[in-house]
Amino acid sequence: MKKDSVIFDLIEKEHQRQLKGIELIASENFVSEQVMQAMGSCMTNKYAEGYPGKRYYGGCEVVDQSEQIAIDRIKQLYGAEWANVQPHSGAQANMAVLLACLEAGDTFMGLNLEHGGHLSHGSLVNSSGILYRPIGYNLSEETGMVDYDHMEKMAIEHKPKLIIGGGSAYSREWDYKRMREIADKVGALLMIDMAHPAGLIAAGLLENPVKYAHIVTSTTHKTLRGPRGGIILMGKDFDNPWGKKTPKGEIKKMSALLDSAVFPGVQGGPLEHVIAAKAVAFGEALDPSFKEYQTQVKKNAAVLAQAFMDKGYKVISGGTDNHSMLIDLRPKFPELTGKVAEKALVAADITVNKNMVPFDSRSAFQTSGFRVGTPAITTRGVKEDKMGYIVELIDRVLSAPEDEAVIASVRTEVNRMMADYPLFAW
């Protein structure tokens, strides 16, 4: 069969883009060679509807072992009693939890998208906001942090069946203990989406939500540095609180409802090649070197945030506790949108993403800010001594976002700098 040169040429172009640039998108990372090998393996050929030992297809003996290893490793990593590693993405994992916990029209709470939440936490254009009744909570305008007193007041008023914590653009630690107290007070379940800080949590550098939440979801490809995918965890299994029963009249465990919500609820056959790659990544995360890597991720982020503030940029909440930060452009460049900033920086081979900031007057297509993070550049071996220089390069571009000569000059410096770093150094 003839090799598809069109696609493989594009793959090489993407490889070169990744090698030459400074990758600052907070949700992106670079995986190891062995994770990619597992993902591109013959495991992709196997259909395996169901779960290990309970499949609807024959010949699943090997993929059963691979999936069970992934389950065992992720449980060990977070101290969980139960895990499902089949969700194709974090959004699919969240969709499955909502399907298991809510009926159509039920009320739940999540962080508003404009304040750093995620589409799957109740956005009206997402199934979570179409099928159910979302109530959004906000950040404090003064501090840029979650206002737990306001969250509690809203929970008492709206009586949600489920409260969701976690977000896609929130740089601070979450108070899981307080959130569990709020959930218990109103009789709600607590779900934490730890997709962004999952790697830092696995390394013990941030609080583990598995100790407090009824259910925890995550992606596997951000700070956890695995293939693109999702997981669902529970610290401890429990009887479902709605009295749903098995055909034999026994109260169903929450794990049974969640398993059924993933398959056949929102998915068919699992991606066993991706699950194999997840298992490899989870094994890497159990190695002591992973904590060293995550420590550097956090250190780089703290220094990067301070460098932005030293240059006169507003960092929402005044800093970061994790790998990410949200930059509000309005105080320094009132007329500059996140869209224009992103385009100019990408042209200089510095990749960021435009992002709404709390109480933003601009739309999600324009925005008044952008989001940055350090997982990917840290994987390449970049240390904190380069953070000030990176902000200097960004500032030069944003000070003249339409000046092609400035952009070309910065791009040359970026390419020269990144030529010293491999794609995967840890």
Curated annotation (Swiss-Prot):
The Gene Ontology biological process terms listed for this entry are:
glycine biosynthetic process from serine; tetrahydrofolate interconversion
Q: Where does (6S)-5,6,7,8-tetrahydrofolate bind?
A: 113, 117-119, 363-365
Q: Which UniProt keywords apply?
A: Amino-acid biosynthesis, Cytoplasm, One-carbon metabolism, Pyridoxal phosphate, Transferase
Question: What broad class of enzyme is this?
Answer: transferase
Q: Which residues carry this modification: N6-(pyridoxal phosphate)lysine?
A: 222
UniProt keyword tRNA processing present:
no
The protein's annotated pathway: One-carbon metabolism; tetrahydrofolate interconversion; Amino-acid biosynthesis; glycine biosynthesis; glycine from L-serine: step 1/1
Where is it localised? Cytoplasm
Q: Site (Plays an important role in substrate specificity): which residue positions?
A: 221
Kindly list the GO molecular function terms attached to this UniProt entry.
glycine hydroxymethyltransferase activity; pyridoxal phosphate binding
Gene3D superfamilies the UniProt entry points to: Aspartate Aminotransferase, domain 1 (3.90.1150.10), Type I PLP-dependent aspartate aminotransferase-like (Major domain) (3.40.640.10)
Q: Give the family, as the similarity comment puts it.
A: Belongs to the SHMT family.
Q: Report the HAMAP family cross-referenced here.
A: SHMT
Assembly behavior: Homodimer.
Q: What role is this protein assigned?
A: Catalyzes the reversible interconversion of serine and glycine with tetrahydrofolate (THF) serving as the one-carbon carrier. This reaction serves as the major source of one-carbon groups required for the biosynthesis of purines, thymidylate, methionine, and other important biomolecules. Also exhibits THF-independent aldolase activity toward beta-hydroxyamino acids, producing glycine and aldehydes, via a retro-aldol mechanism.
Task: Indicate what this protein is called per its UniProt record.
Answer: Serine hydroxymethyltransferase
Q: Specify the species.
A: Porphyromonas gingivalis (strain ATCC BAA-308 / W83)
Lineage in the entry?
A: Bacteria, Pseudomonadati, Bacteroidota, Bacteroidia, Bacteroidales
